[in-house]
Amino acid sequence: MATHLFDLTGKIALVTGASRGIGEEIAKLLAEQGAHVIVSSRKIEDCQRVANEIIAANGKAEAFACHVGKLEDIAEIFEYIRKEHGRLDILVNNAAANPYFGHILDTDIGAYNKTVEVNIRGYFFMSIEAGKLMKEQGSGAIVNTASVNALQPGDRQGIYSITKAAVVNMTKAFAKECGPLGIRMNALLPGLTKTKFASALFENEDIYKSWMDTIPLRRHAEPREMAGTVLYLVSDAASYTNGECIVVDGGLTI
């Protein structure tokens, strides 16, 4: 049974990028604590799988496909939320794009646009639409998934690192302007986590070893280890936490 501080019973939560990895674990943990979770990602069948697993575990969930890089998709999902639920208590911006892994000088315009459209523009306009609903109800919590690359740019991850640094400042800007409206925004900065999204780092032995040599815990994280921080940030336990960017990296950035 959920404890009082972390109880999300009756809350409506939207988690993007929730069909796998960190997003999937966030969606499942929020549901375990009582939230009704809207599982969102680009492919409806992947979202439905996660929603079905939540429901099978006696949780509340539904699937809704949304490509956050497309403004029309953002408008559609929030029209649905407003019509079907009339409120949104929690938004977790977790969808991300990292199409290019290589030297920064070789970044092409296609990779640049795709990364910026999802990681910056997508987060920005998802937050605006969520913020409008939350302003009406006088409360809400938004969490952005950034990255330790926002603090220490990753080798051969230039444009991705740049967008995640933007997410950190976006978090602080929204927190400052929306705090008076009862809306909190914080960010999670994961370290090296075993996901399909980060597969390029695990497949390159030299890069993986360089990470292991610099992480004091001498291991990578599992997706579930990121979800707990998000639960804290969206719960009453963090009711006075606003504009914070919490690093969960095994000590990498010490």
Spans of model-derived segments:
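Substrate-binding pocket helix/loop in short-chain dehydrogenase/reductase
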Residues: G102-I104, D108-N113, W211
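Conserved glycine-rich cofactor-binding loop
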Residues: I12, S19-R20
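The beta1-alpha1 cofactor-binding region of Rossmann-like NAD(H)/NADP(H)-dependent oxidoreductases
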Residues: I44, A65-I77, I109
